[in-house]
Swiss-Prot record:
It comes from Vanderwaltozyma polyspora (strain ATCC 22028 / DSM 70294 / BCRC 21397 / CBS 2163 / NBRC 10782 / NRRL Y-8283 / UCD 57-17). Homodimer. Pathway: Purine metabolism; AMP biosynthesis via de novo pathway; AMP from IMP: step 1/2. Its EC number is 6.3.4.4. IMP binds at residues 12-15, 37-40, 134, 148, 230, 245, 309. It comes from the Eukaryota. This is Adenylosuccinate synthetase.
Amino acid sequence: MVNVVLGSQWGDEGKGKLVDLLVGKYDIVARCAGGNNAGHTIVVNGIKYDFHMLPSGLVNPNCSNLLGNGVVIHVPSLFSELNNLSEKGLKDCDKRLFISSRAHIVFDFHQHTDKLRELELKGISKDGKNIGTTGKGIGPTYSTKASRSGLRVHHLVNDQPGAWEEFEAKYRRLLKTRRERYGDFEYDPEEELNRYKKYKELLKPMVVDSVFFINNAIANGKKILVEGANALMLDIDFGTYPFVTSSSTGIGGVITGLGVSPRHINEVYGVVKAYTTRVGEGPFPTEQLNEQGEKLQTIGAEFGVTTGRKRRCGWLDLVVLKYSAMINGYTSLNITKLDVLDTFKEIPVGVSYSINGKKLDSFPEDLINLGNVDVEYVTLPGWDQDITKITEFDQLPENAKKYLKFIEDFVGIPIEWVGTGPARESMLHRDV
């Protein structure tokens, strides 16, 4: 059985908290896409754990964790993250972590050229805007993957005669093409290669044929939870291109990033922030560049875990949610951070887009059109009540229930969980 947790907006919805809540019921937690450009925080027994690349199932000592073939791995960051978790009391994480032999490696020069590429794109952009990359080398690594010149984990850990020499030769060719593309930037390949000789031995015990690993687990009745990274609106195909990440962040990325058949996927949980946020540039129809937006940002503590950047804030956009639900096929929803709306007297919700008075039937793929939409709002009454101490769904204020019911009715998907505060236990559940 495979269940999936996916972000429905532009990321930072609180996926990790739901995974943390569910992980005790699963044998394996897997990631299928992205790298250390993701970021979420989990609080367990008062200890805060920051996750970027690693599956958050590591907080459960009885759970195995998998980085699938669709993930791109910056090896130094992987070990740094493992060390940080160990220092905070999570033991034997390296023994509970398995890494796909097919996953591609992010080198330091990928990160360096990521920033150069950002400057280049800004220079040719009509409005001079950045894509908003995290600078972690994710895009350049997926680029070399697509051009069939990248290096995978199995290239690094192979012990056959001549394998290291082949790895080194491919590495140098890859670096040479980067320098031809971006100029002779300052870089020490010998230092990086020496580091990878050491990483090779440390990585080897964790590396598996992930396609066999996960399908064998399915065949043996293991329960698997897939932890999506980023969110649908950052998907390379379905997001607000080019202000997106470089991988498939929706349900398609689960299939291609793990090698799992669609027929094995059971539940798909869509995580939805009760309002909308976005990090970096790109269109954001319901953004509030006013006191309301600042209030959402302040109360919601909207700063990125990975970048530290302020998140842009706006009202819940049900056009976005309906679009992502259509693609990902959510079976139920988790509404997060509902408590951030506690003090708002009125809460507008975006329900449709129009251009020049003409209502749009679908989410615009063209950013010029998207940047010119007028949003139709329905304004719902607030509840003006602290909900952070509430422990049962039925105890929510009537207007909070009406807000949730409006969402359910609009998208036609039941809400199974509601987040009412930052604490681990601040999550209401109801049977759907």
